[in-house]
Amino acid sequence: MAYPLQYGLQDATSPIMEELLHFHDHTLMIVFLISFLVLYVIFAMLSTKLTHTSTMDAQEVETIWTILPAVILVLIALPSLRILYMMDEIYNPALTVKTMGHQWYWSYEYTDYEDLNFDSYMIPTTELKPGELRLLEVDNRVVLPMELPIRMLVSSEDVLHSWAVPSLGLKTDTIPGRLNQATLSSTRPGLFYGQCSEICGSNHSFMPIVLEMVPLKQFESWSATMI
């Protein structure tokens, strides 16, 4: 989860998020290099008295500033496309969960089980227990097994929503009449928080998401009690 005054991304909990963190660092270094180069050129132009008003043509310089940006764009695009295709790949999911967005709560259905579904509402501030997080706790958490590929099918019953869990690198739009899918896999147990990330009305801020990633045996025990 995020902390006050945190300027970086959340700690990665999935392979996809780890790739996104590496891509973020890779791109940020390129941006820094470009920024330093531009600032150096500006400083050099302002601080020197030498001018080249007679220069009308410089083929070498034009070639460099045409090829160099193209190379930089390729260096950014290739890892980006790789991650994009990785996010679309789903290999034999061990579990499928369908989530529907509503104004203003989420409903979940474990499609591999005959009757395992529930609604998930935010717990009001007045009902929070000591240690619980304001605007992030829900009455029913989404319990999932860790270290297994899980497919999420997302849609909406009313307006546009967005099902997002930053530490897992997930953000999928929920669109009425359309079924989108995403894949997730957690490398460690714990509670992972998210929220609706598409403005959907007056209570948009009150649609938290809580994933509880547990070992497989614990998930099987939980699912047996819920059926």
UniProtKB/Swiss-Prot annotation:
In the record, the note on similarity to other proteins reads: Belongs to the cytochrome c oxidase subunit 2 family.
Q: What is this protein called?
A: Cytochrome c oxidase subunit 2
Question: Quaternary structure?
Answer: Component of the cytochrome c oxidase (complex IV, CIV), a multisubunit enzyme composed of 14 subunits. The complex is composed of a catalytic core of 3 subunits MT-CO1, MT-CO2 and MT-CO3, encoded in the mitochondrial DNA, and 11 supernumerary subunits COX4I, COX5A, COX5B, COX6A, COX6B, COX6C, COX7A, COX7B, COX7C, COX8 and NDUFA4, which are encoded in the nuclear genome.
Q: Where does Cu cation A1 bind?
A: H161, C196, C200, M207
Where Cu cation A2 binds, per the record, is at: C196, E198, C200, H204
This enzyme catalyses: 4 Fe(II)-[cytochrome c] + O2 + 8 H(+)(in) = 4 Fe(III)-[cytochrome c] + 2 H2O + 4 H(+)(out)
Subcellular location(s) of the protein: Mitochondrion inner membrane
GO cellular-component terms in the record?
mitochondrial inner membrane; respiratory chain complex IV
Q: What is its EC number?
A: 7.1.1.9
Q: Which UniProt keywords apply?
A: Copper, Electron transport, Magnesium, Membrane, Metal-binding, Mitochondrion, Mitochondrion inner membrane, Respiratory chain, Translocase, Transmembrane, Transmembrane helix, Transport
Q: List, in alphabetical order, the GO biological process terms annotated in this UniProt record.
A: ATP synthesis coupled electron transport
Topology with respect to the bilayer: Multi-pass membrane protein
Among PANTHER family, the record links this protein to: CYTOCHROME C OXIDASE SUBUNIT 2, CYTOCHROME C OXIDASE, SUBUNIT II
Q: Which PROSITE patterns match?
A: COX2, COX2_CUA, COX2_TM
The main location is mitochondrion
Where does this protein hold Mg(2+)? E198
Role, per record: Component of the cytochrome c oxidase, the last enzyme in the mitochondrial electron transport chain which drives oxidative phosphorylation. The respiratory chain contains 3 multisubunit complexes succinate dehydrogenase (complex II, CII), ubiquinol-cytochrome c oxidoreductase (cytochrome b-c1 complex, complex III, CIII) and cytochrome c oxidase (complex IV, CIV), that cooperate to transfer electrons derived from NADH and succinate to molecular oxygen, creating an electrochemical gradient over the inner membrane that drives transmembrane transport and the ATP synthase.
- Name any cofactors this protein relies on: Cu cation
